[in-house]
């Protein structure tokens, strides 16, 4: 097969869209922490000096939304003299939340196809299609380009938070291009980092000097540490390294661009390496299959790869609003499977319970915020929902399921 280059991007927690995802999920955490049966569909908008939260919420919880929003924005790094025009202390916070539609609630509360089984009584919160993916390119069974991009974004945020690079500001993006030969990653072709910074960097004020200093620092303190344990590493003489290609990046965050919840769905998943059903995750409670079924689809795909039944798997699920059982299940192994796609699909149908109620129960999706000191989804909202070695995510824990699948084939 001819060689090709595949590219994926990530963004830091200070990117305007990611601020919104984290705010929406912090609100979800706070509501589920007090009332695990909360129904939440929370959208956030940020712009210069403004944060608006809107959507639908039905919950017994009592939450100080305004203070919570300010706390999230402050933790990201938008406060004080280095706030870059967006300050947690002074921005306006508007709350416009309504109750969930009773027409939607009745279908979720009592599924159209229920049979007395409690899992049959929870219908899907909406129609839709969801995809899950896994491959053997990394230890966490994720595509290498998005895995690398997230590593760089996390490291970029770390050296900002710990003061290693004091001139860095919260907004930033990374992009990684990987060379593939015979469908296997063989080299890192290009790394791009765009990072917000102060107007003066280490006493340097010229645009050229600032970019040179940032490039030097990022290679040594971000790129090298983020990739040191990988078999495929960037090589300074061969890997193209681009930093702030426009020259400078002083105005950023909500001061530079408006942000919205759900605009980084490819960053949240597989970096474009697999298909996406179109539904965002953040701000949605587990009855929304956009979120819970996408987590389940990842669990299925990762289990199949971990069991050695294929080296690359994509799983599609579809649902109808108010109906518990999936409308369809499809497994595609791209020729890498030890059995046909039809046989893999049958195996999944027989071994995985993909009703929303069962997914919620298996992963503990309603109780996780309470079990983890009031915050869970907020931590997942930045740097990807899958393949997270830094977080203990239930849909990533496939060891036992992989063993079950292996045993089922004996």
From Swiss-Prot:
Q: Which domain of life is it from?
A: Bacteria
Where is ATP bound in this sequence? 15, 171-173, 248-249, 257, 263-264, 280, 284
Q: Name one Pfam family in it.
A: S-AdoMet_synt_C
Q: What biological process terms from GO does the record include? A: one-carbon metabolic process; S-adenosylmethionine biosynthetic process
State if ATP-binding is listed as a keyword: yes
Where this protein primarily resides, as one coarse class? cytoplasm
Q: Where does K(+) bind?
A: 43
* Any one GO CC term of the record: cytoplasm
What are the UniProt keywords, alphabetically? ATP-binding, Cytoplasm, Magnesium, Metal-binding, Nucleotide-binding, One-carbon metabolism, Potassium, Transferase
Q: Which residues form a coiled coil?
A: none
GO molecular function, a single term: methionine adenosyltransferase activity
Q: Give yes or no: UniProt keyword Cell cycle.
A: no
What this chain does, per the entry, is described as: Catalyzes the formation of S-adenosylmethionine (AdoMet) from methionine and ATP. The overall synthetic reaction is composed of two sequential steps, AdoMet formation and the subsequent tripolyphosphate hydrolysis which occurs prior to release of AdoMet from the enzyme.
Quaternary state and interactors: Homotetramer; dimer of dimers.
Q: Which family does it belong to?
A: Belongs to the AdoMet synthase family.
Q: Which NCBIfam families match?
A: metK
Q: What is this protein called?
A: S-adenosylmethionine synthase
């Amino acid at each position: 097969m001819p060689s090709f280059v595949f590219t994926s991007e990530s963004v830091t927690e200070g990117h305007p869209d990611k601020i919104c995802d984290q705010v929406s999920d912090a609100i979800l955490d706070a509501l589920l922490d007090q009332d695990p049966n909360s129904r939440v569909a929370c959208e956030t908008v940020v712009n210069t000096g403004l944060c608006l939260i809107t959507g639908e919420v039905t919950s017994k919880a009592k939450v100080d939304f305004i203070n919570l929003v300010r706390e999230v924005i402050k933790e990201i790094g938008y406060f004080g003299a280095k706030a870059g025009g967006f300050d947690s202390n002074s921005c306006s916070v508007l709350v416009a939340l309504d109750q969930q539609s009773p027409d939607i609630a009745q279908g979720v509360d009592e599924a159209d196809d229920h049979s007395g089984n409690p899992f049959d009584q929870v219908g899907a919160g909406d129609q839709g299609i969801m995809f899950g993916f896994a491959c053997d390119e990394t230890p966490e069974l994720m595509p290498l380009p998005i895995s690398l991009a997230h590593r760089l974004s996390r490291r970029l945020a770390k050296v900002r938070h710990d003061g290693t690079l004091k001139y860095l500001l919260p907004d930033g993006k990374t992009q990684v291009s990987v060379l593939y030969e015979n469908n296997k990653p063989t080299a890192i072709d290009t790394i791009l980092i765009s990072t917000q910074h102060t107007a003066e960097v280490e006493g340097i004020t010229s645009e050229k000097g600032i970019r040179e200093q940032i490039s030097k620092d990022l290679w040594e303190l971000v790129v090298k540490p983020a990739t040191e344990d990988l078999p495929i590493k960037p090589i300074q003489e061969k890997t193209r390294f681009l930093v702030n290609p426009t020259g400078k990046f002083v105005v950023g965050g909500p001061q530079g661009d408006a942000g919205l919840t759900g605009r980084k769905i490819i960053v949240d998943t597989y970096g474009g390496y697999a298909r996406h059903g179109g539904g965002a995750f953040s701000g949605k409670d587990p009855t929304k299959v956009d979120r819970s079924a996408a987590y389940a689809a990842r669990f299925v795909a990762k289990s199949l790869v971990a069991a050695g039944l294929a080296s690359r798997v994509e799983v599609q699920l579809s649902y109808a609003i108010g109906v518990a059982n999936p409308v369809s299940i499809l497994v595609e192994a791209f020729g890498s499977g030890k059995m046909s796609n039809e046989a893999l699909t049958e195996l999944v149908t027989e071994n995985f319970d993909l009703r929303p109620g069962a997914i919620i129960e298996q992963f503990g999706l309603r109780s996780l915020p309470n079990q983890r000191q009031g915050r869970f989804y907020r931590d997942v909202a930045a740097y990807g929902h899958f393949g997270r070695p830094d977080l203990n995510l239930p849909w990533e824990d496939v060891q036992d399921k992989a063993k079950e699948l292996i045993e089922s084939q004996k």
